[in-house]
C-alpha cells in the first residue's frame, strides 16, 4: 500500500484471507483506488496474473519463515520485473533465496533490521535488480 501513490497499479498476493481483508480495508480507508488483492497460494495466483498479462516493474516478496517457495522463485525469474525486493526473517534462508534468484537478478544491497533487540531475530531486506 505504501507504494500505491507511485504506481499505476498495486496487486497484492497473500496466502492469508484475513490479511487480504485488512489490506482491502486499509486501501479503502486511505482512498487508494489502484490496489487489488488476491488471497490463496501466492505462486498459483501470481502465475494466473502473469498469464492474464500482468507485467510488474517492481515485486516485493515477503514470504513466510520457510523462505520463497521454489515455484515462486521460478515464476519471479520468468516475470523479469526490473526490481525485486526480498524481505526475510531468516538470514540463512534469504541467502538461499538470493542464490536462486541470482540467475536473473543482481543483489544491489542487503540491509538487516534489528526489530527485536537482545534477541537472535533479525529482519533483512534485499534489493535486487534484473540482469541484462
Regions flagged by a language model, labelled:
Residues 1-132:
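Rossmann-like S-adenosyl-L-methionine
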Amino acid at each position: 500500500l505504501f507504494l500505491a501513490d507511485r504506481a499505476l497499479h498495486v496487486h497484492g498476493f497473500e496466502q492469508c484471507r484475513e490479511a487480504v481483508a485488512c489490506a482491502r480495508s486499509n486501501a479503502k480507508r486511505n482512498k487508494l483506488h489502484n490496489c487489488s488483492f488476491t488471497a490463496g497460494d501466492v505462486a498459483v495466483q501470481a502465475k494466473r496474473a502473469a498469464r492474464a498479462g500482468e507485467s510488474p516493474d517492481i515485486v516485493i516478496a515477503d514470504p513466510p519463515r520457510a523462505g520463497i517457495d521454489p515455484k515462486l522463485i521460478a515464476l519471479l525469474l520468468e516475470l523479469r520485473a526490473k526490481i525485486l525486493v526480498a524481505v526475510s526473517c531468516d538470514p540463512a534462508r534469504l541467502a538461499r533465496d538470493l542464490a536462486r534468484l541470482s540467475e536473473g537478478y543482481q543483489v544491489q544491497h542487503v540491509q538487516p533490521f534489528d526489530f527485536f533487540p537482545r534477541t537472535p531475530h533479525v529482519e533483512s531486506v534485499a534489493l535486487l535488480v534484473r540482469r541484462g
